Design a protein with these regions (language model features):
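Alpha-helix capping and helix-coil boundary motifs
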Residues: 45, 70-73, 117-121
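Inter-repeat boundary and helix-capping residues of tandem alpha-helical solenoids
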Residues: 1-4, 46, 50-53, 81
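Short coil/linker segments at helix-helix boundaries
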Residues: 20, 24-41, 61-106
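Carboxylate-rich helix-loop segments that flank metal/cofactor sites and access channels
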Residues: 29-32, 50-54
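Short, charged, low-complexity loops and linkers
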Residues: 9-15, 37-43
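"A position-specific structural signal for the A-helix of alpha-solenoid helical repeats
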Residues: 6-9, 13, 20, 48, ...
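Short coil/turn segments at secondary-structure boundaries
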Residues: 2, 15-22, 44
């Protein structure tokens, strides 16, 4: 009789290992399925579900980064970047009350840095 939490923790560790080996596509696929399973079994706010969602966000970030730095067209990497933004925004919104405000401030700050970088000679 296998305990679901232990099984989910092991699956998460395996997906993290795949991500570290840059097997991003397989890791993202596994994490997407694992997220559905953990949310259904443990609930949306459970620590394991949150950890899976955070790792999935990282997988999408890595996918966007790898595609962008390898010269892929924006239409290829942009969906991964957008999914990353959505996941981390969801995590921020479902954290403590001040987390969303902190997230919004960080986004504005990073956006300003990007604008300043592009304008520098």
């Amino acid at each position: 009789d296998e305990r679901p939490l232990v099984r989910h923790q092991i699956q998460l560790a395996k997906s993290k290992a795949r991500l570290e080996m840059l097997d991003v596509a397989m890791a993202a696929e596994e994490l997407t399925l694992l997220l559905q399973e953990t949310a259904q079994t443990h609930g949306e706010n459970a620590a394991i579900t949150r950890a899976v969602r955070e790792t999935l966000g990282k997988a999408h970030y890595y996918a966007a980064y790898l595609l962008k730095t390898s010269g892929a067209a924006e239409s290829e990497w942009r969906p991964y970047a957008e999914r990353t933004r959505q996941i981390f925004r969801f995590l921020a919104e479902h954290q403590e009350p001040g987390a969303l405000a902190n997230y919004e401030e960080r986004v504005a700050s990073e956006f300003q840095k990007t604008i300043n970088f592009k304008q520098s000679p």
